[in-house]
Amino acid sequence: MARCYSGAMARMKPLPTVWIVSDARNDASIERALARLPRGSGMIVRHYHLAKADRRQRFDRLKRLAWARGHLVALAGDARMARRWGADAAYGSPATLAGGPAVPRLVAIHSLREMRRAARADAVLLSPAFPTRSHPGKAILGPLRFRLIAARSQVPVIALGGMDGHAAKRLKWPRWAAIDAFLR
């Protein structure tokens, strides 16, 4: 598996198994959620609902809190922005992360076709594994299809969509990310 990592990923801390994804709906309690994450987890800062200056300020605060607990921090956006803002990694679609400087890339995918487009990915977030509040009514992958797609990946796969510790066990998958799981 080590040969699959880019040079940027090799310089990064070990890839966390548990991730929290920021969102407008968990923003008010994200600090509390960060404290509940196991040490050395990951955080993907999206905060699309904020203006750029406010988003930067929020990112800097969350990054400090996350780093104090040994968490890795990925910024949703292109690789240039992630590098400028001092993120550990960039998070986005295959198209958003196709170019730019060498930073670790976490690419959001929903199908085998999108996985093929994620050529510069260091890891992929495959969703939706299960029903999710983010995309109500959207078709899900389910455990079987999720594992079939994940088995074709050349890079680590992180499950997203309706995930929490119980869903990860049901999916039989070690790496997972969630928006709501740590708010309970």
Language model features: what each stretch is:
Residues 11, 42-103:
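N-terminal active-site wall of soluble small-molecule enzyme domains
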Residues 85, 101-151:
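Glycine/Thr-rich beta-alpha phosphate-binding loop at enzyme active sites
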Residues 18-22, 72-77, 87-94, 104-110, ...:
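Short, hydrophobic beta-strand segments that form beta-sheet elements in well-ordered domains
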Residues 1-32:
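N-terminal amphipathic alpha-helix/helix-capping segment at the start of soluble metabolic enzymes
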Residues 20, 90-101, 123-140, 160-184:
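Glycine-rich phosphate-binding active-site loops on the catalytic face of alpha/beta enzymes
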Residues 32-39, 64-68, 119-120:
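Acidic (Asp/Glu)-rich catalytic clusters
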Residues 20, 43, 82, 118, ...:
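Conserved, mostly hydrophobic/aromatic
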Residues 23-37, 78-80, 111-117, 164-167:
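Short, acidic/polar
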